[in-house]
Structure formats: structure tokens, C-alpha cells
Amino acid sequence: MKIDILTLFPDMFTGVFGSSILKKAQEKEAVNLRVVNFRDYTTSKHNSVDDYPYGGGAGMVLTPQPIFDAVEDLTKETERKPRVVLMCPQGERFTQKKAEELAGEEHLIFVCGHYEGYDERIREHLVTDEISIGDYVLTGGELASMVITDSVVRLLPGVLGNHASQVEDSFSTGLLEHPHYTRPADFRGMKVPDVLMSGNHKNIDEWRHKESLRRTYTRRPDLLDERELSKQEKKWLEEIKREQ
């Protein structure tokens, strides 16, 4: 996969893209990450990428020319049209399902804005997606693009050492992930559940499944509205409700 980031602040990405999973993914050639300063594409004699909004108002608006030219340059040698994703608080809420969808693409371009906003023609005629990572406002789209890049890249084949970890992640199954424990079995009187040390894998799987359901019901009950529960899950859910 190829991922290009269009930004005015490329230095922000150095640490994130040069460490942990994203670094390993690049070393394995699972992904090619490029950070591009779209100011390099401006034709303004003052090297500017923004201007005052028509009709008046506070703030500056990103002009279309450098962003259009940057995207066109990055895609001139590609056969398949890439997904051009605008980081925007007005966009579609980012979810695990969206991450899985984007992970199936060959080429992604993330456009990170600053200032008051984007010229509307960028939205109407250039981008394919607008994505928000939450109902709050950031200084720019850089942090949001890092979040999405990390979420997408870890889904690529061969990136994670254990595929089971990916499958069992919170949201991948529609439920929040179950609790985890490690040594020691007794820490200051706080003990690991006996079932996890029983060696009975069937009982362990059932415990983890039920605890995932419990955690989802307690912390994110809205997720259960989107999930068709199995007969066993419905039974467990009734037990969980009685235990509350």
C-alpha cells in the first residue's frame, strides 16, 4: 500500500512514522509512507497557501491550487484512482469498519488542513472521503491522519506478528476486547481469575467472550444495537444484567 500525507507541517510525522508498528511496516515493505508539504506546489509569488474568505469573516481559507496540483502530481503515474481523504470535523466518524475498508485500497492520500478551513471546491471536486476522528476540533488534520494511518496500516497483511491479536482487537468483532492478565497470579491480593489458569481452552474462550460482552454492555452499550446477538450471547447478557 502507498499512503501520502499532504501537510504544511511534515516534521510532525517524523517520530510517529519512524517508530513502532509503522516503522516495522515500512521495513517489511507492507506500506510506503510519504509526507509531502503542499506549500511546495503553490504558484503564489509570496509562497502562500491560504487567503481571506469571500464574503468576509474570521480566519484564513486554504486555496485550492496547491492541493489540487499536489494530488494530481502524486497520482499521475497511478493506474487506479486513489482514495483522497480530507481530515475534517464535519466528516464521517472514523470507525474500525472504515479502517478495514481503507486497508483494502492500494493508494491513500490524506489531506491535512489548517487555518479556518478548505476552499469548498476541494471538497466538491477533489476528495473522495471526509473523515472525522471525533466530535472535537484540532489545530489541524495532522494528528487525525496519524491516528487513521496507524489504524489502517496495522491491518495490512504481515504487519502484526500475531493475526489473532488483530482479529480479537476491540471493535473488530463488534465487541470491546476482554480483560487481560499476566504474571504474577496474585499481586497484592489481587488474583487472576481461576478459569484463565485452568488450561481448559473452551472455558477460557467462553469466559473471554462473556467478559467482552459485559465490557461492551457496561462501557459502550450503543455497539450492541448494531450487533445481532447469538442465542448464547443473549443468555449471557441477561445474566450480566442480573449481576449489575
Curated annotation (Swiss-Prot):
Pfam families on file: tRNA_m1G_MT
What reactions does this protein catalyze? guanosine(37) in tRNA + S-adenosyl-L-methionine = N(1)-methylguanosine(37) in tRNA + S-adenosyl-L-homocysteine + H(+)
Q: Give the top-rank taxon of the lineage listed in the UniProt record for this protein.
A: Bacteria
One GO MF term on file is: tRNA (guanine(37)-N1)-methyltransferase activity
Keyword set, alphabetical order: Cytoplasm, Methyltransferase, S-adenosyl-L-methionine, Transferase, tRNA processing
Location of this chain's protein in the cell = Cytoplasm
| GO annotation, biological process | tRNA N1-guanine methylation
List the GO terms this entry assigns under cellular component, sorted alphabetically. cytosol
Q: Where is the signal peptide?
A: none
Binding-site residues, S-adenosyl-L-methionine: G113, I133, G134, D135, Y136, V137, L138
Q: What class of enzyme is it?
A: transferase
| Alphabetized InterPro entries for the sequence | Alpha/beta_knot_MTases (IPR029028), tRNA_m1G_MeTrfase_C_sf (IPR023148), tRNA_m1G_MeTrfase_TrmD (IPR002649), tRNA_m1G_MTases_N (IPR029026), tRNA_MeTrfase_TRMD/TRM10 (IPR016009)
EC assignment: the record states 2.1.1.228
Provide the primary localization: cytoplasm
SUPFAM superfamilies named among the record's database cross-references: alpha/beta knot
Q: Give the function comment from the record.
A: Specifically methylates guanosine-37 in various tRNAs.
Family membership noted in the UniProt record:
Belongs to the RNA methyltransferase TrmD family.
Q: How does it assemble?
A: Homodimer.
Q: What is this protein identified as?
A: tRNA (guanine-N(1)-)-methyltransferase
The source organism is Bacillus cereus (strain ATCC 14579 / DSM 31 / CCUG 7414 / JCM 2152 / NBRC 15305 / NCIMB 9373 / NCTC 2599 / NRRL B-3711)
- Name of the gene encoding the protein in the UniProt record: trmD
